[in-house]
Amino acid sequence: MLSKSEIETNKVKFIEILKTALINRPGVRLENLIQALSSSDFFIAPASCKYHANYEGGLCAHSLNVYNNLMNILEMENDTTIDHESATIVALLHDVSKMNYYEPYYQNKKIYSENGSKYDELGKYDWKSVLAYKHKDSDKQFIYGNHEMNAEFIARCYIPLTVEESIAILHHMGGKSQDSAQDNLSEIYKKYPLALYLHLADMIATFVDENK
């Protein structure tokens, strides 16, 4: 869980990194992009409804984790062929389609503690109403294609993406995406290493950084 101050800190950090990376790219509608993110729930939304970073502010936190992981991978691999600007764009915006995608609700959940007033095979507990998230109805979502296609389209509305940037966003989920699994991922990752690096950075964030 993140505090309100941590959520705000992540928002400021995200915008600062994005501005620094895009300051010299021609054709960028940077202020429009920031306005679109700020007027949506991007900075307070979860990254998922059941799994990684499924809490308020989780989407922005996850995006920053992916950014940090991607920069670490590039440094570790000593790969100077990948442009820092491109790496920043795909890391911060690979999940941008998750803005306005989830909605909060409250569900009853067993909270186990030594002071619980009820008891089952796992121990003492009480029922408490806790914040949770679910997918919005499809008529309330932006739908262009699948998750990756939606993200690439939204990013492209504000940033003239290179081919490698588009491919990285489109294939950041690797074989976990049904659509991507039908493509020749090995050839894609060989030809466009940024796509592979982004996939690895995303998996590390999801299954390591946000699973502690």
Describe each model-derived feature in a short phrase.
Residues 1-120, 125-127:
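Acidic/His-rich, divalent-metal-binding segments that scaffold phosphate/diphosphate chemistry
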Residues 49, 53-55, 79-211:
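Divalent metal-dependent catalytic cores for phosphoryl transfer on phosphate-bearing substrates
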